[in-house]
Every structure is written in structure tokens, then in C-alpha cells.
Amino acid sequence: MGRPLICMTLTCDTLAENVELVKKYEKEIDLVELRVDFLNEDEQLFVRKFPSMINLPCILTIRRDVDGGLFSGGEFSRTSLFARALAFANQDTAKNFAYVDFEDDFNIPSIQDAALAFGTRIIRSHHNMSEPVYDIVEKCNSMRKTGFEIPKIAFMPKQLSDVTRLFQEGKKVQGDHILCAMGPEGMPSRILSTFSNSYLTYISPKETMQNVKEVRQLTPYEVNELYRFKSISENTKLFGLLGWPLVKTDSPVIHNFGYRKFGMDACYFPIRTPIVSDALHFADYLNITGMSVTIPHKESVLYYLHEQSPEVVNIGACNTIVKRNNKWIGYNTDAYGFKRSLEEFIGDFKIKRKKVSAEVICRDFFASFEQGVHHRQ
């Protein structure tokens, strides 16, 4: 199996606006998904011509509101739109939709047969916008009506362990399939699609990201430049930033830039969870050998460490954990970084006629800081 494809979701009001986005990003993606449910009603009547307006394969999707989409016109109207979009197949298959997304409960034999006859591959999808899907292997097998269909499961995880299960189950699914955990906690499933054997990962351009904010897709920049999605393989070293809720962080930018600069096959990404044990189980399964630790886990992570550096023992907090010989070892690089910066800025100096080293200042600073944190709590 090759690397997962990058599919950009198109959610503009008009076909013309969607075409412009395809032209802008076509060198960074492999295919697009036309979300007909986002189009103006007048525009929906002309979706048949869209594949001939672009130079990339296209998925036809008309997502119902119950599945997280905008279409609320009823199944008869939606079926008519599907039929209209797939009709009059062109002998040049590049001018037809390459894929069509049918939900697992959408069973209209005439339209399904037409899609197969025209060479349009069916993605058979199941969406749960409020809960995880537990029986992923069984669900994928039951949705695959023919050998040409691609089962797709997208769900909203309740905790990181649901995402871990997605990776575990993904390895067991036979044939092409698409797996995606939505929302901030599910982001690793989009970045690391290789590790779930997913056929593709969905992204959205920054111009329309607001339209899919609830499911939290990646942007073309994030998938290509920040996480270097196309180069991720089973051999890529994985590292993460453990925290909650991690609304905004520059750590992936800093670390991944460093990996690229020094030619390292590595990827650093956010691991969002309020439960430390879930993160460690996630890391164990994906063979993540190091994590930065930030709020609120710098103290709670101590319980799970097999060893602690002297700095961690003295300060009572940990900001870095490394796995060696199947044991998690905790370090605190905040103290070292502060000490180094202080030495460079002022060196050793005299206070009240006593020479005080930067090391002593750092020790007192972090001890006072930790006490302050406890008092505020």
C-alpha cells in the first residue's frame, strides 16, 4: 500500500470559488471532495460539470445534516442530485467523478449500479458526530457491499483511548478503508494516517476552515510543511506534546523545523488529553519515545515515571519524558534553560556583597514558582 492520499474538502458557495481553491492548492494535494451540501441551491444543479473544470480526481459528497453536513432537503431530493451528478458519463473518465460518498444506510441500487458502471468508486461512509465507533473492523466489513467499495468511518472521540483504538483496529481492516477521529483529540488520526492504513486524509484550505471547525481538519500548510505528511512512514520517529486543552502552541513548528533542518525522519505533534495514562498508552502503541509535557500534567505525570532526574526531584515538576528500555524517565529542562539564559544575560553577580551563582538563583526561582502554583490552587 502506498502512502495515504491528501484530499482537500471544498465547501464554498459556488463552483467557481471551489475551482479557484483547487487551482491554488492543486500541487499540494492528490484529490478533492466537492461538498454539494455547501453549495447554493442554484449551483447544485450544475455539479455534473465540476470534474471537467479541474485537473484532479474528485469525490462527490452530499452530506446530510444528521451526519454533520448541511443538506436537509430530504432523501428524495438528495437522491435526485446524486443521479443528476452521475448521469451522462463521459468516455474520458477524468471528466467524471472519481468517487461518490454514500452513507452506509443509503441503498438505491440504480444509482449504485450506475456509479460502478461508469467507473466511479463508492465510498461507503458512517459518521457519528457525538460518540466513538468501537467495532471498527466489523463495521468496515459490513459496509463493504462489493469489493470495489471503500468503507469510511468518522467519529467524534470522547477521549484519547478512542483514538488509540482507531489505530489498533485500522491495522486489522483488510483492503482500502478510511478512518478518521474528528475534533482536537482526533488530530493524530489525520496526521498519522499511515499508521492506521487509511486510504486518505481530509484537509481544508484556510479560506474555508470556519466551515469545518467542529471536525478540525488540517490545512494544506499543516499537512505538507508542518507535519511533512507525505514523508511519514512506519520508520518515522514519533514525538509529541502532551497537554490539555492545548488550544495554541508553537512547539510543533519549532521541533519539526529542527527535524527538517538536520535531515531527521521524525514528526512532532500535539497529544491532547486530560488523562495522562491515556497518553502513555497511546504512546506505547505508536512507539512514541519522547514527549514534552505541559499544563496541566507537569506534576501529575510524576506518578507514572519509572525514574526522575535530580531536577525533577528538586523542583517537583517534569516537562520532558523519554522512553528507554520500556521505562519512562522524567526530566525538567525548564531549569536548565532558565539557568543558561540567566548566565548569558548577567553571568555571576553580587547581591548584598555575596556572590550568587545563576544555579542558585534558578533553584530558588523554581522552588518559589512551584510554591506559588500550589497556593493559587
Q: Which residue stretches match the model-derived regions?
A:
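Catalytic alpha/beta core domains of metabolic enzymes, predominantly
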Residues: 90, 104-237
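Phosphate/diphosphate ligand-binding glycine-rich loop within oxidoreductases
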Residues: 236-348
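Active-site glycine-rich loop that binds ribose-phosphate moieties when present
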Residues: 80, 84, 135-140, 337-349, ...
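Active-site beta->alpha loop and helix N-cap motifs at the rims of alpha/beta catalytic domains
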Residues: 1-124, 129-133
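Glycine-rich phosphate/diphosphate-binding loop of Rossmann-like nucleotide-binding domains
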Residues: 349-377
